[in-house]
Amino acid sequence: MARKLEGKIAIVTGGTTGIGLATAKRFATEGARVFVTGRRQGELDAAVAAIGPRATGIKADSANLNELNRLCERIKTEAGRIDVLFVNAGGGSMLPLGSIIEEQYDDTFGRNVKGALFTVQKALPLLVDGASVILTGSNVSIKGTPAFSVYSASKAAVRNFARSWTLDLKSRGIRVNVISPGPIKTPGLVDLAGPDAAQQQSLLDTMASTVPLGRVGDPDEVAGAAVFLASSDASFIAGTELFVDGGQAQI
């Protein structure tokens, strides 16, 4: 059976854990050469070892424009082009309105909005016509979530990027889409509950109770959706948002 990404050059930002790592593994399994980025060298080395020989790790902070420039220069030198760009780096923390501070706002929007914007902008000269750009959103962007307003607003911005950039890039046939996960069992999610294992499990159980399918998702389930959007199977899909959330956003 033919592999869906045979011979493609794929970039996964934030590819050292969770959804990013699972997606990088799937891209490699489907035949792509995968460049993964991360901010910590130890995690990056471990991710490359887990993905296998088709992976290359590049230390880069997506919110730092100088590091993005270096990232793209290296990809230009080593691969010459980008067929698939998965903009996954980001994150956030929970604070109610009265406790939000400037540093939290700047960090969240810096990673999720500024980072996404300039990652795609810097990659434009390397993106082939007809490339697939996939942005990681979140289903909280379309609903109210207590103590999560900054993160939710940042992901609403990401959702609009896909709409607007689809028009900006239509002459090149570049498809820009958003994957919006619901509760997925990743380190980033469980860490919201703090270091206590019982509290982490309580958070997962609470979130599972709000999902029509009755559970939280697995990173590999999001990775499967990313493979679909990256491949020719999604050749007529652009500017859209694919929810991978067990139906949570639909109720």
Residue ranges and their predicted role:
Residues 9, 16-18:
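Conserved glycine-rich cofactor-binding loop
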Residues 96-97, 101-109, 207:
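Substrate-binding pocket helix/loop in short-chain dehydrogenase/reductase
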Residues 120, 154, 162:
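Active-site helix of classical SDR
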Residues 125, 167-168, 235:
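Alpha-helical segment proximal to the catalytic Tyr-Lys
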Residues 138:
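Residue(s) in the substrate-gating loop at a strand-loop-helix junction
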Residues 143, 227, 238-251:
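Short C-terminal tail/terminal secondary-structure segment
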Residues 170, 175, 237-239:
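Short, small/polar-rich loop/turn modules that mediate ligand/substrate recognition or access, typified
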